[in-house]
Structures are given as C-alpha cells and as structure tokens.
C-alpha cells in the first residue's frame, strides 16, 4: 500500500449521498471535441443525418484508423465549431434505439484471441478512445503498445462518487474488461484502488492490484504512474477509468456499445447532492434542471479542481468525467477582504481564523479573491505536490515556456489534473493546467 501524505482534501459543502439513483431523462447528448487533445476530425455525418448508437461520426487525421462513434441513436442536430474551425461538439437529439452490432467474445475466447482481434472490436465500437497515453494524454495510435496500463479504480476528487458503488454493481463486466486490457500489453495492468476496497481482478497473470491511501491526489492516474511505472519521452503507458473498463466487458459480452455513466451531481449549489445514473455525453442543462439553488451558477463537467466550465456548445458531460459540480459565480468584491479574520474562509496557509476549526466545511464559489500577479514561492506548492519533483521550479519553467528545463523537471509525467492543486493554492492566481498543455503540445511538436 502506498500512502500519499502531501495533498489536500478540500473541505467543501455539498457532498453527494453515496447511493445510486436514476437521473432525469436525457433528450440530447454530445461528443465533445475538447476531450481529445490534438484531434483533427474528418466528418462522416452532417447536420440532419439520422445515426444509430455506435455509428461512426468522424475519424481522426492524427491517429489514423481511430473511430469516434455516436453515444445515442437519433438525429445530428448540431456540429459546433470554434476559432479556426476547431470542433467543439457534435450534438445528437435522441430518437429511437437503433444500434450497430459488434463482435461478442466469451471469457475463454478473450483469453485465446489474438491482440489484433480485440483492438479491432474496440476501434469499431469507438471504445478505443477511452484509452489515453501518458505522456501527452492523447488517444493512442493503433500500432502502439504500452509499457503498462493503469486502471483508475478510485477517486479522491472533491464531491466524487465512490467507485465501489459502480464496480460492485457490475463486477463481472469489470473483470472481463480487465481481461481485455491484459491482452493489449505485454507489461502489467495495474488496478489502482483505495486501501481496503474490494476490487475484482482478472485471472490474467499480468493484472496486479495496487492500493493507495491518503489525501487527494492519491486517486489521480498521474500519482499512480509516478510511483509504479514512471514515463519518459521514450516510454509510454496508457490509462483508463473504471467505468470504461466496465464498458469494455459489456461490449464484448453484448455486442452493443454501452453508454451508461454513473456520476455525482454535487456541490454547494445543488439542492439534493447525490449519485445519479445517466448516459455518456448527457446534456448538463437537462441533468441539472430543477436541481440547483437560486443564483448565478457555474456548472462544471468534472471536478471543481480540474473540470471544464460548460457553455452552450459544450454543456454536456465530458468523455472522461465522473462528476458534475456546481458552484456559485463569485461576483462579490468584499471591501478590504484581506483584513477580515476569515472565520468563513479557507486557505492552505495559516492566515485565517478558520484554521482553528479543523472539521469545518465551506461554501466555495468561483471567486479567486484577486487577479493574476507575480508567482511567489511561499511553500504552498510543496504542501500539495506528492510527486518526487520540484514544483516551484517546474511551474516557473512552464510559465516562461522553457520546455527543455520542464522536461528535465518531470513535466512529461503530468496531465492538467496533476497540477490542479497547484493552481488552487497559487498566490499568483495562475491556471497551470492550460499552461502545461501548451508546453506539452510544443514538446510533442518539436520532438
């Protein structure tokens, strides 16, 4: 068991009730382009086309042969593009239940099948896109083989659902999904779970369970990779979420693309925080309708630390998100706020009176209580960075765009979520996730 001691469990109100309930009916879903870094689509459909569940919507020029399939049967109602015609979303109004069929395999057939047969089934169904590489967090090339695969079967994000609720319901499908993953690599398949959790495993010899405990980011894939099989410019691993492992198992037994998604609907502005069963790419306006407190609310697909702020073209559940968080927009500017005692304010530094009340939770808003300013090294980053890197030096290097120094300091190990806590505690109010992504894009492009 690996214990994470440096990090932060955010004391935020609105934690979800840990039992799965059915969510509201969803009438529209979308596939979000921003979920796939560097993707350049070649469209197979246009607005007004009827599509089946699992039908190809587009392919990717950058990862030849990879297919992106429809998360529902219905009509393509919008193809939204932004600047430079970057794909924002493909929206589908749900209608009917027509679905594409894919090959089925028994557990014995999976064990004896060659790797290419399993890859072909994942590609045809669109579930190949559930895999992400590290470094760069991109959909892997079809001819690539990872050094190992990491299954994230725990979640330490604020307001997250307990993965054991979901895995416990579909343990057989989870185990079968692990058997599929075991055939995709000659290395280990690490199933990373919370200490004390009961997680099904596979009979495959290369599947290995690893327990983690401690504060967030103990549940991040980047943390698991750092301690178990660190990556480099010449060494790649893949990551996948626990609900996608279940989807792998269901695909190979049913021959139909699974689209169920269990998410937490939580946060200070949710009237009844709970865990709901919905579907992949669900409209967040429909999912949260009648569920929010009064006020100007920000709906976030994902964690409050590293999720995506939703706007009209992209107000849908992200491909890799297992939660929907809602915060009040922080428009107020209190007079001389820096002079208050701070009984109702939170800081990782001992500057507020609230530090004396250890168990108190706070109604966080989107306010940063200040504008962007110079980066000040006061030891805040070191308090929340559990990885064996120098966070202050790394953050400075990516701010100035020194990619050579950033690589030497370990940026290739990281994804946006791995620097989310650094953004939260930053006295300079920097958002390090987008800065890291810009640097990773340059490194990959320049070699």
From Swiss-Prot:
HAMAP family: NqrA. Keywords: Ion transport, NAD, Sodium, Sodium transport, Translocase, Transport, Ubiquinone. It holds the Pfam family NQRA_SLBB. Signal peptide: none annotated. This is Na(+)-translocating NADH-quinone reductase subunit A. Coiled coil: none annotated. The gene is nqrA. It comes from the Bacteria. The lineage of its organism: Bacteria, Pseudomonadati, Pseudomonadota, Gammaproteobacteria, Cellvibrionales. Belongs to the NqrA family.
């Amino acid at each position: 068991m690996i214990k994470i001691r440096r990090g932060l469990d955010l004391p935020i109100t609105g934690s979800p009730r840990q039992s799965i309930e059915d969510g509201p009916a969803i009438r529209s879903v979308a596939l979000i382009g921003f979920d796939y870094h560097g993707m350049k689509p070649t469209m197979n459909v246009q607005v007004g086309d009827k599509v089946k569940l699992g039908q190809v919507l587009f392919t990717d020029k950058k990862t030849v042969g990879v297919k992106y399939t429809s998360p529902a049967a219905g009509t393509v109602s919008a193809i939204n593009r932004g600047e430079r015609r970057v794909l924002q979303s493909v929206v589908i109004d749900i209608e009917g239940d027509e679905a594409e069929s894919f090959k089925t395999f028994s557990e014995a057939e999976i064990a004896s099948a060659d790797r290419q047969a399993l890859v072909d089934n994942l590609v045809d169904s669109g579930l190949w896109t559930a895999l992400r590489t590290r470094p760069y967090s991109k959909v892997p090339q079809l001819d690539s083989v990872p050094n190992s695969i990491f299954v994230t079967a725990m979640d330490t994000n604020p307001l997250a659902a307990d993965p054991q609720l979901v895995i416990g319901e579909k343990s057989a499908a989870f185990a079968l999904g692990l058997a599929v993953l075991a055939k995709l690599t000659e290395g280990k398949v690490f199933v990373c779970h919370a200490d004390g959790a009961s997680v099904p495993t596979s009979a495959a010899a290369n599947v290995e369970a690893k327990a983690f405990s401690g504060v967030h980011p103990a549940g991040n894939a980047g943390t698991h990779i750092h301690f178990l099989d660190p990556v480099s410019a010449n060494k790649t691993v893949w990551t996948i979420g626990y609900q996608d492992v279940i989807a792998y198992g269901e695909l190979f037994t049913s021959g139909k693309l699974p689209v169920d998604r269990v998410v937490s609907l939580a946060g200070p502005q949710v009237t009844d925080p709970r865990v709901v069963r919905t579907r992949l790419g669900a409209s967040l306006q429909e999912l949260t309708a009648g569920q929010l407190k009064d006020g100007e609310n920000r709906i976030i697909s994902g964690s409050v630390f590293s999720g995506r702020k939703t706007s009209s073209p992209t107000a849908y559940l992200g491909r890799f998100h297992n939660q929907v968080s809602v915060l009040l927009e922080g428009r107020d500017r209190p007079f001389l706020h820096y002079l208050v005692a701070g009984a109702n304010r939170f800081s990782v530094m001992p500057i507020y009176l609230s530090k004396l009340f250890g168990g108190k939770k706070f109604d966080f808003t989107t306010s940063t209580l200040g504008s962007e300013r110079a980066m000040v090294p006061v030891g805040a980053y070191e308090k929340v960075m559990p990885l064996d890197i120098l966070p202050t030096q790394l953050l400075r290097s990516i701010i100035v765009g020194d990619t050579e120094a950033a690589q030497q300091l370990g940026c290739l190990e990281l994804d946006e979520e791995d620097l989310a806590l650094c953004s939260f505690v930053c006295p300079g109010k920097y958002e390090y996730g987008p800065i890291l992504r810009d640097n990773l894009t340059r490194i990959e492009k320049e070699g």
